[in-house]
Amino acid sequence: SEEWDKVRGEASPYGNAWDFRTNREGLLRYWGDALKERGRYENMITIGMRGERDSALLGEGSPVEDNVTLLKEIITAQRGLIRSLEQEGLVRENAPQMLAVYKEVEEYYYGNEKISGLYQWDGLDGVICMLSDDNFGHLRTLPTSRMREHKGGYGMYYHLDYHGSPVSYEWVESTPFSQVWEQMTEAWDY
């Protein structure tokens, strides 16, 4: 992220690597300082992690199982940090927490034949899971009947413009209002 680029470095108290395996303490310190600064305000706390520059967490081609295991470790540490700061009065009590199920982590959310994904994991109880569109204004998924049992509920991330590879469309009315209405009505009615 742009914010991480401003604070990272060899001499930084947060370290240089956006990698939980090699820079766990630095990232927890970074997230903790952000929570201490902003946690008493009315806001939603995002949890989870993607790779640098919105990439896959452990890189392209890495096994889903390894990514799911690491993401569970990250979320467990983040939720522990939030609870700890909440007890100290540095984070608003019961502030909502949200996991964004972007395309980079969607496979880890659902899992595969070798590992259950995050959506069946009780470590996300009480967390809002924000599903995402396909970057072009089309819903990727809606919660199944089993997913609807999730304690925390769901939200929807919807692009009206997009900045990213392979194409960017920004500040241009590129998603017709009729499509926005149709897609968001489908999500609402579901």
Give the residues covered by each predicted segment.
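Gly/Pro-rich turn-and-neighbor structural signature
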Residues: 24-151, 172
